[in-house]
Structures are given as structure tokens and as C-alpha cells.
């Protein structure tokens, strides 16, 4: 394996990078699926937790915190409720991981050919991460929307299967229905992935040489720190994306029946601030950060190990 911050940029064949990215996404998604469902439920909840009067006309559950939300889902929907939306999510994560790492590798190789006008390493990582994140997000967005809608279902099922959900959305909402909130997603993921990769590439060479690192290795620790910092900065757009994804004819049928009607990213932000305050933009942030740390650590660790395994296997042939 190569040293320093170049390890993600130039190692492995295209096939190895695609396969390693797909494996990393698959493993990561399955491990953090319960936290993802909890996060989505909290993000879609609009009533105040500190004002009991706002609970008077609420139809559906009232979630308070990560652990209590998890317990409520298990009690009302069974343990499998924590993996709702896992099929479209697994498909999304595999495709996303493969596209993301491939685009990142390709972009950095293109930027490396700009000599003698090559960008500084940190800026190069930022641009590559932004391009990779934007492309992967837009390409897999319909699966992201399906994941959210399945996770938002309570005991009453709106969609009975993945195929049925695709047919229903296509019939009742048209092609645009699969891209509700896509602008918020791209607006969120471009700076997120740019910041994530720039931080990760900067930290990994430093942390990889240290012993007794938390999370098991320098790769994982760098992934955790990079993810937490980037996630906090763009979280309001993530919440807006979730609220927009459940708009349409099924808006009042999810586990939270009182989801307002939102139109557009900026009007959604304004409405949330007006009715719920600035804190309303950060609902679910705690569980999001709890999820982001292991998810990114698992993703980067699995990617690095998968790539090394495939590389060693090829050399041994």
C-alpha cells in the first residue's frame, strides 16, 4: 500500500476500486441501519418535545431521544422495524460506494495531470470529494428517497414492496416524484464529501503512525473525525431533504401524520425556523453524529482492507 494521502487516489485497478467501494457501502449500511431509521423518524417529527401542549392533537408516536425511539419502534413494530427501508438502502449504498470511490479516484488522476498548475493537496481532495459525492448522490437519489419513505412507514404499510413503491410513485407522482428534495441532497453532499475527504486525507498520514488509536486504526479514526466535523456543518440540509422526500400524495400516511406541506429548499428552511425555531433544523443531529462515526469508520476501514485483499489476491495469481 502506498504511503500518505495518495493511497485513495492511485491504488488499485478500476475494477478493484468499484468492488471495494461496493463492499464498503454494503457492510456499513447493514451495521448502522437501526440508527438510520431512528434518525429519519426524529427528523420528520415536527412537534415540540419541551411543550406538552403541542402533543394534544398529535396522531402517531412521540419520540424522545435515540434510545427511547429505538425502544418504541421495537415495541410497536418489532425488531425488524429497525431495518425498514434496508433493501433500497443496501442497493443505494453499494451503488453509491462504487460510484463515489471510482469518481474520486478518476477526478484525482485528472487533477494530477494539471502540472505545473496542480492544485494544493487539500484543495485537490476537496474538489475530488465534492465531484464524487455530487455524482454518486444524484445517480442513486431515487433509492435514497425510497429508503426514507420505507423507514417513515409505521405499522400501516403504504408500500408493500420495492417494486410496488416504484410503480406507485411513477403512476401518482411521475418521474419527478423520485427526485423530491434532490437539490437539498446535492447541496448537502457536495460540501460534506469535499470536507470529509479533505480532512480524511490530511489526518490519515498523521494518525496511521500512532499506536493504540481509538476505533482500531488510523484509517478508522481519521474517518470518524472527518465525518463528524462535516456532518455537523451540513445537517440542516439533510433534515430538509428528508422532509421534502415524504411530500406528495402519501404525506399524511406515514408514522407522523402531521408532516406539513413543504415547497422548495429555502421555503422549507424558512418555515421550520418560523414554526420550530433554529433548533428545529437540528432534530436528529445527535443520532446522526452517533451514526456518522461508525458508518464512516466502517466504510473507510472496509474499503482499505477490501482493496488490499483484492490487490494481494491479484499479485498472488
Swiss-Prot record:
Annotated membrane-spanning segments are 17-35, 91-107, 126-146, 181-198, 220-240, 284-301
Report the SS bond pairs: none
* Principal cellular location given in the protein's record: mitochondrion
Q: Which domain of life is it from?
A: Eukaryota
Q: Which InterPro entries does the UniProt entry name for this protein?
A: Mit_carrier, Mitochondrial_Carrier, Mitochondrial_sb/sol_carrier, Mt_carrier_dom_sf
GO molecular-function terms, A-Z: transmembrane transporter activity
Keyword Membrane in annotation:
yes
Intervals holding Solcar repeats: 12-110, 120-206, 214-309
User: Is the keyword RNA-binding assigned to this protein?
Assistant: no
Give the membrane topology.
Multi-pass membrane protein
Its annotated compartments are:
Mitochondrion inner membrane
**Cellular component, GO, one term:** mitochondrial inner membrane
* Keyword annotations from UniProtKB, A to Z: Membrane, Mitochondrion, Mitochondrion inner membrane, Repeat, Transmembrane, Transmembrane helix, Transport
Q: Which family does it belong to?
A: Belongs to the mitochondrial carrier (TC 2.A.29) family.
Known function: Mitochondrial transporter that mediates uptake of thiamine pyrophosphate (ThPP) into mitochondria.
Q: What is this protein called?
A: Mitochondrial thiamine pyrophosphate carrier 1
In its UniProt entry, the species of origin is given as Neosartorya fischeri (strain ATCC 1020 / DSM 3700 / CBS 544.65 / FGSC A1164 / JCM 1740 / NRRL 181 / WB 181) (Aspergillus fischerianus)
Amino acid at each position: 500500500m502506498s504511503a500518505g494521502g495518495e493511497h485513495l487516489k492511485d491504488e488499485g485497478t478500476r475494477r478493484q476500486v468499484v468492488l471495494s467501494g461496493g463492499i464498503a457501502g454494503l457492510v456499513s449500511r447493514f451495521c448502522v441501519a437501526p440508527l438510520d431509521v431512528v434518525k429519519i423518524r426524529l427528523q420528520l417529527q415536527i412537534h415540540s418535545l419541551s411543550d406538552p401542549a403541542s402533543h394534544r392533537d398529535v396522531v402517531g408516536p412521540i419520540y424522545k431521544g435515540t434510545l427511547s425511539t429505538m425502544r418504541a419502534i421495537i415495541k410497536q413494530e418489532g425488531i425488524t422495524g429497525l431495518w425498514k427501508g434496508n433493501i433500497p438502502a443496501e442497493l443505494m449504498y453499494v451503488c453509491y460506494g462504487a460510484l463515489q470511490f471510482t469518481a474520486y479516484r478518476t477526478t484525482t488522476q485528472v487533477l494530477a495531470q494539471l502540472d505545473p498548475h496542480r492544485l494544493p493537496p487539500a484543495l485537490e481532495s476537496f474538489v475530488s470529494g465534492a465531484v464524487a459525492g455530487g455524482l454518486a448522490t444524484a445517480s442513486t437519489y431515487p433509492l435514497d428517497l425510497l429508503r426514507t419513505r420505507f423507514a417513515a412507514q409505521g405499522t400501516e404499510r403504504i408500500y408493500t414492496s420495492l417494486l410496488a413503491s416504484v410503480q406507485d410513485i411513477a403512476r401518482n407522482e411521475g418521474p419527478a416524484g423520485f427526485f423530491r428534495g434532490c437539490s437539498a441532497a446535492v447541496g448537502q453532499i457536495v460540501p460534506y464529501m469535499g470536507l470529509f475527504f479533505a480532512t480524511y486525507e490530511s489526518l490519515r498520514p498523521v494518525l496511521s503512525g500512532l499506536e493504540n488509536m481509538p476505533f482500531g486504526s488510523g484509517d478508522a479514526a481519521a474517518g470518524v473525525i472527518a465525518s463528524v466535523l462535516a456532518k455537523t456543518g451540513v445537517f440542516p440540509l439533510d433534515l430538509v431533504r428528508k422532509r421534502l422526500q415524504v411530500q406528495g400524495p402519501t404525506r399524511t400516511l406515514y408514522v407522523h401524520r402531521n408532516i406539513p406541506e413543504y415547497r422548495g429548499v429555502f421555503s422549507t428552511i424558512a418555515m421550520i425556523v418560523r414554526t420550530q425555531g433554529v433548533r428545529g433544523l437540528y432534530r436528529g443531529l445527535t443520532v446522526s453524529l452517533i451514526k456518522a462515526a461508525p458508518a464512516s469508520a466502517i466504510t473507510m476501514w472496509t474499503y482499505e482492507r477490501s482493496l488490499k485483499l483484492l490487490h494481494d489476491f491479484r499479485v498472488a495469481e
